[in-house]
């Protein structure tokens, strides 16, 4: 369990003569922040231990890690250093303000992580992958999507589920369905035991259309591929994953699309 806390440093923005006047106050603030952070993390650890003891949580090995810095940067740095198989984060889910999307730590990690990220909305009960029966995989017919699909299936081999291949389109196009059908046939040969469906979802209002599809088809997890983009693209043209974490109460699994 990784927690990152941010300690604001005011001294650098103060005139030189005022730094000494604020130094003691700043040190006290930092001490107070550290005490609060340690207390909260210990309380969380005790809560997890209690749930493990009661049998509500599985008896697995875990550690608590505390880091100081900008949350998204420290999470990505820790991931690069320790190479976890997956990063699990929480989101506030549906009906959040769009302006919050700009400063979302989870959204930033999703777009920059090279490790799969599972984002779980706060009001969504999600205890284990054994309960996952239907996964929606969104594809744009990019070769990297196929690689990500392989990664998804190989990672979840011990579990039993079906997959719906989804393509977002502005208008109904027979060619899109033909391509989806071809992808389905390809993966059906690779994974004969896997139940695969495919569908095209209208892209004119894709968030609501996709939400309706998820409800109608009882989708447990939405999966999609993230691609490397520069900072201006991320700010002014938010990707599907960044939009969806604020408009869906379904867990979102994002897999980095590795180049061929």
Functional labels for PLM-detected ranges:
Residues 59, 85-91, 97, 101, ...:
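Intrinsically disordered or low-complexity boundary/linker segments at protein termini
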Residues 102-105, 178-183, 236-241:
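Charged helix-capping and loop-helix junction motifs
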Residues 34-45, 180:
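N-terminal membrane-insertion helices
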Residues 6-9, 46-87, 190-238, 242, ...:
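Structural beta-alpha unit
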Residues 107, 150-153, 185, 211, ...:
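Active-site phosphate/pyrophosphate- and oxyanion-stabilizing loops and adjacent acidic/basic residues
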Residues 88-91, 119, 165-167, 223-226:
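Short beta-strands and strand-loop turn motifs
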């Amino acid at each position: 369990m990784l927690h990152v806390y941010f300690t604001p440093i005011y001294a650098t923005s103060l005139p030189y003569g005022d730094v000494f006047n604020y130094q003691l106050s700043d040190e006290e603030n930092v001490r107070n922040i550290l005490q609060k952070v340690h207390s909260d993390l210990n309380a969380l650890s005790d809560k997890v231990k209690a749930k493990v003891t009661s049998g509500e949580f599985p008896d697995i090995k875990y550690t608590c890690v505390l880091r100081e810095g900008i949350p998204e940067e420290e999470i990505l740095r820790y991931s690069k250093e320790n190479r976890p198989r997956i990063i699990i984060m929480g989101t506030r889910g549906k009906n959040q303000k769009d302006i919050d999307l700009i400063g979302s730590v989870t959204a930033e990690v999703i777009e920059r992580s090279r490790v799969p990220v599972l984002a779980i909305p706060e009001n969504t009960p999600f205890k284990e992958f054994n309960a996952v029966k239907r996964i929606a995989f969104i594809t744009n017919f990019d070769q990297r999507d196929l690689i990500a699909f392989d990664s998804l299936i190989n990672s979840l081999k011990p579990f039993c589920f079906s997959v719906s291949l989804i393509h977002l389109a502005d208008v109904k196009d027979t060619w899109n369905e033909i391509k989806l059908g071809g992808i389905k046939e390809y993966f059906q040969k690779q994974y004969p035991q896997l139940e695969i469906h495919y569908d095209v979802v209208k892209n004119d209002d894709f968030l609501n259309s996709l939400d309706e599809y998820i409800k109608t088809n009882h989708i447990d997890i939405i999966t999609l591929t993230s691609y490397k983009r520069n900072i201006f693209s991320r700010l002014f043209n938010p990707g599907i994953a960044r939009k969806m974490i604020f408009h869906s109460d379904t867990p979102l699994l994002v897999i980095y699309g590795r180049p061929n």
